[in-house]
From Swiss-Prot:
Topology with respect to the bilayer: Peripheral membrane protein
Domain of life: Bacteria
Localisation: Cell membrane
InterPro entries membership: ATP_synth_F1_ATPase_gsu (IPR035968), ATP_synth_F1_gsu (IPR000131), ATP_synth_F1_gsu_CS (IPR023632)
Organism: Streptococcus pyogenes serotype M3 (strain ATCC BAA-595 / MGAS315)
One annotated Gene Ontology cellular component of this protein: plasma membrane
Family stated for the protein in its record: Belongs to the ATPase gamma chain family.
One biological process term in Gene Ontology: proton motive force-driven plasma membrane ATP synthesis
Gene3D superfamilies in UniProt: 3.40.1380.10, ATP synthase, gamma subunit, helix hairpin domain (1.10.287.80)
Assembly mode: F-type ATPases have 2 components, CF(1) - the catalytic core - and CF(0) - the membrane proton channel. CF(1) has five subunits: alpha(3), beta(3), gamma(1), delta(1), epsilon(1). CF(0) has three main subunits: a, b and c.
Keywords linked to the UniProt accession: ATP synthesis, Cell membrane, CF(1), Hydrogen ion transport, Ion transport, Membrane, Transport
Lineage: Bacteria, Bacillati, Bacillota, Bacilli, Lactobacillales
Protein's UniProt name: ATP synthase gamma chain
One MF term in the entry's GO annotations: proton-transporting ATP synthase activity, rotational mechanism
NCBIfam families the UniProt entry points to: ATPsyn_F1gamma, PRK05621.2-1
Amino acid sequence: MAGSLSEIKAKIISTEKTSKITSAMRMVSSAKLVRSEQAARDFQIYASKIRQITTDLLKSELTIGSDNPMLVSRPVKKTGYIVITSDKGLVGGYNSKILKSVMDMITEYHADGDYEIISIGSVGSDFFKARGMNVAFELRGLADQPSFEQVRQIISQSVDMFVNEIFDELYVCYNHHVNSLTSQVRVQQMLPISDLVADEAAEEGVTGFELEPNRHDILDQLLPQFTESLIYGAIIDAKTAEHAAGMTAMQTATDNAKNVINDLTIQYNRARQAAITQEITEIVAGANALE
């Protein structure tokens, strides 16, 4: 019985240590989440402005027609997917949701292998490579608060692959942050640009100004920046969802550890009570034997 008591006590101590670790990790993820949510809000200011300017410029461009490859739909022979996952685990179902969604799409629409994957995150890269899938580029070791400079190259490569007709449409697949408990899988078309309509532009915008050198040349410079900003925004959004998933997973782990500790404590008390009862019984039996 003493051995049993010591074993239970050791389990309680071990679980308490685990609970402290998961609680600390939850607080770290919570702090990262707050910073990511602020970064996402700050980015939306820039994203809204560049969208307004781009849409305003396209008001007349759509009227006269544009041959910019980023605006022109062409027959789809191959599709590109930017897939955003985490670099580490301990984030609950964050990675499994997006990877399942991507696999379902590829199974349904790309049985002939007419796709390219641009993978951001080690979990996704390892997953796709282990299955022999078409991974064109990958980015590992993304910072908790990624800067545009860190992702500029892989984003630019993705846009260039579309412009150079390596694939004919580009989607970004990621977990959209809703709140600390919820995220939603998003598969968002980035290229060709098709969701900018003239009535989205502000009533007073750059259409009232003379532009140098001309609208066409400005759009050639602006459209890649606009698309790259959308992809970067998706990365920030995905990182925010990742931190929320990590916080939730660690909170769940902490709660489970506390439940285990409670169960072990009850088990320990019962075992201790049984041991004491047995000792008393033995003492009484010994005393009776002496009479």
